Amino acid sequence: MYSKFQNKFLTADNKKRAFIETEKLKTLWFNTGTLCNLACKGCYIESNPKNDRLAYLSFNEFKSFVNESIQNEMGTEKIGFTGGEPFMNKDIFKMIKYSLDNGFKTLVLTNAMKPMLNNKNDLFRLNHLNLTIRVSIDHYLKEKHEQIRGPNSWAPMIEGLKWLSKNNFNYCLATRLMWNEDETTTRENFKTFIRDNELKINADSKIQLVTFAEMDEKSDTPEITTECWKILNKNQSEVMCSSSRMIVKKKENDYPSVIACTLLPYNSEFDLGNTLKESLKKIYLNHPHCSKFCVLGGSSCG
């Protein structure tokens, strides 16, 4: 017998661990660096103003992976930027432009605060049908949002949202299901927030208001076996790593790495090499996030 999530190939009760096979990389995620203007409680990637564990990705590093995908016809449709706070990376606008110029749907995750607002002119010039800005908001009430994100984090976020709306950007919201409130209730309460702030968001849309299952590596969650797909009536293709990868630049490394999952940037088991081609290998679901967030939670970062 093993402890849970210890053996790559077998679960604690000695059953074959579920795995994912990848054929196309529909979504390429780029972590622009872990530095952030906020230090949110429970940040899965531990971003804050001092954490540079993932260094800033340069434009040339980004470009090499995009070109690899294009040249090898890997089926990429969307490019996503996450952090940290992407707008703190000086090359972010060059990266967004290159993504759009090559015809990719482009998604930027942001807190919509000063790093974005201080660069409004640069962002405005890139406004495009294929560009979507996803703004993180941890609650529809200021008090609870600031419990997670810290004091004075609400008003700048609202300012950023209203600027995006006024300037006709494609934008959406992302929130966490962490308040002992079911998703239906959360969406109903967000309708009031959206109406009060005159935003162009449909709270019933799972695309315009994205809800994420809460992640806690220490909480107990079942391991996923090869038998679970049939039991749960789920398909491997529904799991994020079946069609996506994330590129990160670890501070101690000379070259960026390709990671299986946006949620596991520091776990060496999910580091798949330095090229997209190398990364096309089986991904064994050997982490609590694989179970709770992706398979049972049905969440996806894209």
Model-derived regions: residue spans:
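A short small-residue
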Residues: 46, 139-141, 171
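Intrinsically disordered, low-complexity coil segments
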Residues: 67-76, 202-203, 251-255
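Conserved hydrophobic residues forming the short capping helix/wall of the S-adenosyl-L-methionine
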Residues: 69, 124, 194, 198
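Conserved C-terminal portion of the radical SAM core fold
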Residues: 75-80, 106-107, 130-137, 155-221
